[in-house]
Structure formats: structure tokens, C-alpha cells
């Protein structure tokens, strides 16, 4: 006998789109700003012969693509469930976050390669021009960061975009510093060194986002949900004899789900009934854990052995 229910929260495709779609307008503004700065920095990099500027513009170009994918993911995440896609397309934002990680890694590799080439074949960078375009890039990135600051706490998709823009802002600072060094001392290696620093700044943020994204795709238990504690709370419910096939995973940002087979004594089922038992389990988990949707299968004693025989 089985029963599924939720905690009274929104769930399914609507909930999946909520965390990210609330920031759709801000993502669009950040995308427009980023595309504009890509063009400006490419022009500046060519005029100033600055690898740091060119590398930063290449990084920002991947960011623009990432922001575009984030917006596309929102579109798919808000599509309703179907017979085949029973959770809707909520996980589109997780795939977008993964793609952003790969783009960031590619951008970092490109910057490292070009920096090494610049050490082998030095070039004369125009410090003043590089400084001007570096400042323009920094101001634009700070505006984009302010647009995405709040959303990055609620959505992996938005967080991916936020981290990319943050890396760009740090990259702009690095360009500014290297430009000042070249202006004051004429030391040209400052430009490729700045490029390597940009690559190093990309790596740790990308790794953190990649781990979180893979955790969702591998259906690991949601962060903050202790499965041992969940089991203990279920077992503490009056009439519950055992719990098995306990699983918790995350569909997308802000949508953790849980399922369990709960063995209940015949006396408890007779005394309180299935509906009340489900409400007690609901209250048990709803009061202690942040789970968007729960599915419980209530079973009599010995049913687990019956399931095992059916599976072999």
C-alpha cells in the first residue's frame, strides 16, 4: 500500500522554476552588460596589445554564453511535466551549471596557454590603454554582480553566472594592477603574469560549483539533510517498526525530495488509519528537515521479504 504527499509547499515544475526564474530580468541585464564589455575589451586588447585584456574578454565571452544558457535553462525549467518528463524539465538548470563549469575550465586553459606563449614571445603592452579598458570592465562587472548577488544564494544556475562574473571582476582588477606596473616600471612580464593570475582565480570557484552540480546529477543526499537523523525521526513515530529503501536527492535548486518504505504495525494501522499515519510522518519530517516533496509507502511486517522475492 502506498501513498505520496508533500509538505504543503509548491512542488513539481512550478517550484523548479521559482528559484531561478525570479531573476530572469537580472540575468538578461547582466548578459547585455557582459556582451557590451566583451566587445569593448577585445578592441582595447588589440589597441593596447594586452594579453591580459584579450584573455579577460575571452573569459567574459564564455560568461556571456553561460548567461545565455542560464536564461535558456529557465525557459525549459518552467515547462510543465509530461508523461515522459514527470518532474518537468527542472534539471535543465543543473545541466546549464555543468556547461558553465566546462566553459570556465576551457577559458582557464586558454589563458594559461596564451600566457606561456607571451613569456616565450614578449610583446609591448600599452599600459595606459590597458588601464582604461580594465577600469571600464571592472565597473561593468560590479554592476552585474549587484544584479546577481541575491539570486546566487537560491539557485545553482544563477550561482554559476554569479561566479563567472565575480571571476571577471577579479580579472579586471588584475588587468588594472598589471597596467599600472607597466606604466610605472615598463616591466612587460606583468601582463602575462596577470593572465596567469586570472586563470588561477577561475579554478577554485569552478571546482566548487562543479562538485555541487555533480552531487545533484549523481543524486547524492541534499546538503543539510542527515539521512541517519531522517531515519531516526521516522522510527520514532508511534507504530513504526522499521524503515527501508530510504532515499533523498535533489531534482534542482530548491527542490529536495525524499522517498521511503515504512513498516507499520497492524495494530497502529488499525488504531489510527493510513491517513493519520501519513500525516504524522509528514509532520515528523516537515518540522525537522527542508524537504520539498515526500513519498511514503506504508507496509505491514514481512512485506520487505515479499518485495525481495519479487525482485529475484
Model region roles, listed by residue range:
Residues 2-25, 29, 52, 58, ...:
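Alpha-helical transmembrane segments and adjacent TM-loop junctions that form the membrane-embedded core
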Residues 28-43, 140:
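First transmembrane helix
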Residues 35, 39, 64, 169-173:
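Hydrophobic alpha-helical transmembrane bundles that constitute the permease/transmembrane domains
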Residues 42-54:
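Short, hydrophobic transmembrane alpha-helix segments
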Amino acid at each position: 500500500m502506498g501513498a505520496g504527499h508533500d509538505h504543503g509547499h509548491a512542488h513539481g515544475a512550478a517550484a523548479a522554476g521559482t528559484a531561478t526564474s525570479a531573476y530572469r530580468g537580472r540575468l538578461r541585464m547582466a548578459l547585455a552588460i557582459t556582451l557590451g564589455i566583451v566587445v569593448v575589451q577585445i578592441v582595447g586588447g588589440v589597441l593596447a596589445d594586452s594579453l591580459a585584456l584579450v584573455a579577460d574578454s575571452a573569459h567574459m565571452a564564455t560568461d556571456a554564453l553561460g548567461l545565455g544558457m542560464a536564461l535558456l535553462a529557465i525557459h525549459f525549467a518552467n515547462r510543465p511535466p509530461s508523461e515522459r518528463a514527470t518532474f518537468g524539465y527542472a534539471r535543465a538548470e543543473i545541466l546549464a551549471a555543468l556547461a558553465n563549469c566546462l566553459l570556465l575550465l576551457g577559458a582557464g586553459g586558454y589563458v594559461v596557454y596564451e600566457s606561456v606563449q607571451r613569456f616565450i614571445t614578449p610583446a609591448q603592452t600599452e599600459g595606459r590603454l590597458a588601464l582604461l579598458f580594465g577600469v571600464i570592465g571592472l565597473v561593468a562587472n560590479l554592476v552585474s554582480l549587484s544584479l546577481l548577488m541575491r539570486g546566487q544564494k537560491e539557485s545553482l544556475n544563477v550561482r554559476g553566472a554569479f561566479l563567472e562574473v565575480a571571476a571577471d571582476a577579479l580579472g579586471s582588477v588584475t588587468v588594472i594592477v598589471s597596467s599600472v606596473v607597466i606604466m610605472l616600471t615598463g616591466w612587460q612580464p606583468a601582463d602575462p603574469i596577470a593572465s596567469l593570475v586570472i586563470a588561477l582565480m577561475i579554478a577554485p570557484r569552478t571546482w566548487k560549483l562543479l562538485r555541487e552540480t555533480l552531487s545533484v546529477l549523481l543524486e547524492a543526499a541534499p546538503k543539510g539533510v542527515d539521512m541517519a537523523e531522517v531515519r531516526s525521526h521516522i522510527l520514532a513515530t508511534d507504530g513504526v517498526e522499521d524503515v527501508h529503501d530510504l532515499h533523498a536527492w535533489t531534482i534542482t535548486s530548491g527542490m529536495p525530495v525524499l522517498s521511503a518504505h515504512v513498516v507499520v504495525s497492524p495494530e497502529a494501522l488499525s488504531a489510527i488509519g493510513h491517513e493519520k499515519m501519513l500525516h504524522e510522518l509528514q509532520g515528523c519530517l516537515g518540522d525537522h528537515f527542508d524537504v520539498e516533496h515526500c513519498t511514503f509507502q506504508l507496509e505491514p511486517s514481512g512485506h520487505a521479504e515479499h518485495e525481495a522475492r519479487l525482485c529475484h
